[in-house]
């Protein structure tokens, strides 16, 4: 039906006859001529219908936006004054001699000349996908997956599919369950990850595995999450955590070079503890140079503990941010920031404006001026390396509240004052996570998952001091986004059972949920490690998209619904009866 694509015609094709298929993007009737911007997935080209060719001109009068058409014509060079340097086909146009209207279109519910609301875009996704922005994102996604497969194949990895219908196991988020018709009252689960299967593959002797795989998690959504998502899943036998990180680092560097023509520097590496202390987050955005500065020792006197109303029995912290040239901030803006940190449970936000360092207490304006003396102020200025014109924001509270509040304030101020360098890429590795986390009842749970190996102790010490265990795990962060996470896995069956015991999984539950893994670990399981990278997030970053929905062809809403197909939906009662499922009234 066609000999060329619209976006691929160039000046070298002048005087050539072409057949094109596509959609009407825009129509302009100038009396003697009708100009049509014709579009396919490669781009736009201008088509001219002349009045002197009246038969085809008359047909062109009926054209409207998004009509699907076929055009036969001759490529001709545009006059210099009419050339459009903004598009790749701007030097040429097509003089049409045949027009076939393949299909008409209703008036569009979307307006491509302005921003449409998200619900309309998702309901009419088949129209939204015609926009060049979304289409370009999907092309880039396609190129990224090609580059990944090429890279992994050259590194001797095998692309192996793992089951979609699998067993429900506790992995953190809720499972999507699938009832079995053949096994009455039993359920499959859609995998949150291929974690256990890829470990089984290592035990099976599959030395290097990878897969670009769909995963499913029934959890609360946000702009960078979807209920079904795609991850680059990797597992390797006989490889250290350091070598896994080097492998992934080289893959990420290749993607950024090929897609964005950017040479990423070597990824720095910091511990979880350092990340929380300096940035208040285990996903720090290093494009923002502001760091949290601990001043607990400066305020250790009892009078300060009393002033800040700190409970000595709690794990407290006093810390601050130094904002360069921020002393100009108004009282209203400071009040806004105070309200902001209160969202993260901080009771108060104190400030010190440095007008003139040399004048000591006379050279500042502060909400805590009445408790400062010259010695304390000097220590604060030296510790924060603050200068004239700077402002210090200080919070005194429980450590986790201080970390979270100053971490979030750091990000907000970085954006508000244009401190965050938006045109930079700052990847890093976070390592040395705690093995376990403790809830308010004192129960322990795995920070990553229960298959992560411990890094700093043997089984005997782990049994007696699980609170001190450090996991051999690692997260990859780019510009504040968690791109991936992985770990060295437990390959000793007794260690695996002990970790299950520590996090409170009873023996009966261990056998019911993980019996196949426990049994497999008894047969010479090799040391192995792996990682999972979020493909959707990688594409979102590389395309500079604001929302992960813009890099997925058919995404869900933040309430996990598909507006185009109106799913999830009810099903026939006969189907439910076959599955032994009954509706319960809420």
From Swiss-Prot:
Domain of life from the UniProt record: Bacteria
Single GO BP term: aspartyl-tRNA aminoacylation
Location(s), subcellular: Cytoplasm
Record's keyword terms, sorted: Aminoacyl-tRNA synthetase, ATP-binding, Cytoplasm, Ligase, Nucleotide-binding, Protein biosynthesis
Cross-referenced Gene3D superfamilies: Bira Bifunctional Protein, Domain 2 (3.30.930.10), GAD-like domain (3.30.1360.30), Nucleic acid-binding proteins (2.40.50.140)
Single GO cellular component term: cytoplasm
Predominant location category: cytoplasm
Keyword Nucleotide-binding attributed: yes
EC annotation from Swiss-Prot or TrEMBL: 6.1.1.12
Stretches the record annotates as Aspartate: 195-198
Pfam families listed in its UniProt record: GAD (PF02938), tRNA-synt_2 (PF00152), tRNA_anti-codon (PF01336)
Annotated L-aspartate binding sites: 171, 217, 448, 489
Reactions listed under catalytic activity: tRNA(Asp) + L-aspartate + ATP = L-aspartyl-tRNA(Asp) + AMP + diphosphate
Sequence similarity: Belongs to the class-II aminoacyl-tRNA synthetase family. Type 1 subfamily.
Function of the molecule: Catalyzes the attachment of L-aspartate to tRNA(Asp) in a two-step reaction: L-aspartate is first activated by ATP to form Asp-AMP and then transferred to the acceptor end of tRNA(Asp).
Subunit note: Homodimer.
Protein name in UniProt: Aspartate--tRNA ligase
Organism: Buchnera aphidicola subsp. Acyrthosiphon pisum (strain Tuc7)
Protein encoded by which gene: aspS
């Amino acid at each position: 039906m066609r000999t060329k694509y619209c976006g691929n015609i160039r000046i070298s094709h002048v005087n050539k006859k072409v057949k094109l298929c596509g959609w009407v993007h825009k129509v302009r009737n100038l009396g003697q001529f009708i100009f049509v911007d014709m579009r396919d997935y490669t781009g736009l080209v201008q088509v001219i219908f002349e009045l002197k060719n009246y038969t085809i001109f008359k047909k062109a009068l009926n054209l409207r936006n998004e009509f699907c058409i076929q055009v036969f014509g001759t490529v001709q060079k545009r006059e210099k004054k009419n050339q459009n340097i903004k598009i790749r086909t701007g030097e040429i146009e097509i003089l049409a001699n045949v027009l076939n209207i393949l299909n008409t279109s209703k008036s569009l519910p979307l307006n491509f000349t302005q921003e449409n609301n998200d619900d309309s875009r998702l309901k009419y996704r088949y129209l939204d996908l015609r926009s060049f922005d979304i289409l370009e994102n999907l092309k880039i996604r396609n190129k990224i997956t090609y580059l990944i497969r090429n890279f992994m194949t050259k590194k001797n990895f095998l692309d192996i599919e793992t089951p979609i219908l699998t067993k429900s196991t506790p992995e953190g988020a809720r499972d999507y369950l699938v009832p079995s018709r053949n096994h009455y009252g039993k359920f499959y689960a859609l995998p949150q990850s291929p974690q256990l299967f890829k470990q089984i593959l290592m035990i099976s002797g599959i030395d290097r595995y990878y897969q670009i795989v769909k995963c499913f998690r029934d959890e609360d959504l946000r702009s960078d999450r979807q209920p079904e998502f795609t991850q680059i899943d990797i597992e390797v036998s006989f490889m250290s955590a350091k070598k896994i990180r080097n492998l992934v680092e080289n893959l990420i560097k290749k993607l950024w070079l090929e897609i964005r023509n950017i040479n990423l520097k070597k990824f720095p590496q910091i511990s979880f503890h350092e990340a929380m202390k300096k940035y208040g987050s285990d996903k720090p955005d290093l494009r923002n140079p502001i760091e949290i500065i601990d001043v607990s020792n400066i305020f250790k006197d009892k009078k300060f503990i009393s002033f800040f109303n700190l409970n000595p029995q709690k794990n407290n912290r006093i810390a601050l941010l130094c904002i360069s040239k921020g002393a100009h901030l108004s009282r209203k803006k400071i009040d806004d920031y105070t309200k902001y940190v209160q969202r993260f449970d901080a009771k108060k936000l104190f400030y010190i404006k440095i007008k003139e360092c040399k004048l000591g207490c006379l050279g500042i304006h502060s909400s805590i001026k009445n408790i400062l003396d010259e010695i304390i102020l000097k220590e604060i200025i030296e510790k924060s390396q603050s200068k004239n014109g700077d402002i210090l924001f200080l919070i005194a509270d429980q450590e986790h509240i201080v970390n979270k509040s100053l971490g979030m304030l750091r990000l907000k101020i970085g954006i508000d004052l244009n401190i965050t360098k938006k045109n930079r890429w700052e990847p890093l590795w976070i390592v040395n996570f705690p093995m376990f986390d403790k809830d308010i009842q004192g129960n322990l749970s795995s920070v990553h998952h229960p298959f992560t190996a411990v890094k700093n102790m043997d089984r005997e010490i782990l049994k007696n001091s699980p609170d001190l265990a450090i996991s051999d795990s690692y997260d990859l962060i780019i510009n504040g986004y968690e791109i991936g996470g992985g770990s060295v896995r437990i390959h000793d069956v007794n260690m695996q059972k002990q970790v299950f015991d520590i996090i409170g999984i009873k023996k009966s539950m261990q056998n019911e949920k993980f019996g196949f893994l426990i049994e497999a670990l008894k047969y010479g399981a090799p040391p192995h490690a792996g990682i999972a990278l979020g493909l959707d997030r990688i594409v979102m970053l590389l395309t500079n998209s604001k929302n992960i929905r813009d890099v997925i062809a058919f995404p869900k809403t933040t309430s996990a619904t598909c507006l185009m197909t109106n799913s999830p939906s009810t099903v026939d009662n006969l189907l439910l009866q076959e599955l032994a499922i009954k509706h319960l009234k809420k």
